[in-house]
């Protein structure tokens, strides 16, 4: 037997020299760093790092769609300052922040579908959750890391682009300091609206992704389901004139963020429903979606 192994080793050009196990001698940083590693790894995968072809291109196209309108407005103002009447180049007239956020919430929805599917589906399909849970990472910490990854990624496209536009408007104003003090409330409204949009779509996307192991199914279900619910709610609002017909908008994933954003910016909702009720509906959807994710992972077999 020994001679046969030696012969095989000599013919194949490879042989076993030694076997054994070594203890990990690196720094042990605890569960917090493990959660951070999960979050950063998910963000990198969601943005297409170390992935081929379309998986790398599509996320950056989505992020580009988020930043392009704001950068275009900034470029227009820089190029035509002094050539057009001052009122024409007013920041609020060219591209109001609420309009920008209404555009962004559609972009955020698409990115949420991709990011949440990338966060939850591969580990379940490859049956590696037991490897996470064998470490100090408990299921709730694992989910927390994935939630952080998706929310931070969505904040990148829901808050940062309008913040850049706001900062540019401050810098391009005739009296930047005066503009800053008089428009500081706009900064807070941008942060509040963008954060709500990111959290709402992150919760919905993660809830959908927690029920399937395939990324395409998760992304398709979120996008298709959102369009279907929005279409039904829109038909009800458009065809039925009773007051109750406006309430399906509280569960419309496309209509609800737009109404809440208008309310944040003090604009008319053109509805008998209070802005507080829209906000409460958004929080309720987030809570139900988070409950669905936790409940789904309690029943996962691995």
Question: What are these model-derived regions, one by one?
Answer:
Residues 10-29, 293:
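Short, contiguous pre-domain boundary segments
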Residues 30-33, 43-62:
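Membrane-interface helix starts
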Residues 63-69, 98-122:
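Long, hydrophobic alpha-helical segments
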């Amino acid at each position: 037997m020994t001679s046969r192994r030696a012969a095989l080793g000599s013919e194949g050009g490879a042989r076993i020299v030694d076997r054994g196990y070594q203890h990990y001698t690196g720094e042990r940083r605890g569960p917090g760093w493990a959660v951070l590693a999960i979050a950063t790894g998910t963000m990198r995968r969601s943005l297409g790092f170390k992935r081929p072809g379309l998986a790398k291109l599509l996320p950056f196209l989505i992020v580009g769609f988020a930043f392009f309108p704001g950068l275009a407005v900034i470029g227009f103002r820089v190029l035509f300052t002094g050539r057009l009447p001052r009122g024409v180049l007013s920041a609020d007239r060219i591209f109001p922040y609420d309009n920008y956020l209404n555009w962004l919430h559609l972009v955020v929805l698409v990115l949420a579908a991709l990011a949440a599917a990338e966060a939850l589906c591969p580990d379940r399909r490859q049956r590696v959750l037991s490897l996470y849970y064998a470490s100090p990472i408990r299921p709730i910490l694992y989910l927390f890391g994935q939630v952080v990854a998706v929310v931070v990624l969505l904040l990148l496209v829901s808050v940062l682009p309008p913040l850049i536009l706001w900062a540019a408007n401050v810098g391009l104003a005739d009296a930047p300091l005066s503009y800053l003090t008089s428009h500081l409330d706009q900064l807070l409204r941008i942060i509040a609206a963008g954060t709500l949009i990111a959290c709402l779509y992150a919760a919905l996307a993660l809830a959908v992704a927690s029920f399937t192991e395939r990324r395409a199914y998760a992304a398709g279900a979120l996008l298709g389901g959102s369009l279907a619910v929005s279409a039904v709610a829109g038909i009800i609002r458009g065809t039925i004139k009773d007051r109750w017909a406006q309430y399906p908008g509280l569960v419309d994933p496309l209509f609800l963020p737009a109404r809440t954003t208008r309310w944040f910016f003090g604009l008319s909702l053109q509805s008998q429903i209070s802005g507080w009720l829209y906000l409460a509906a958004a929080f309720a959807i987030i809570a139900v979606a988070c409950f669905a994710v936790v409940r789904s992972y309690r029943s996962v077999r691995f």
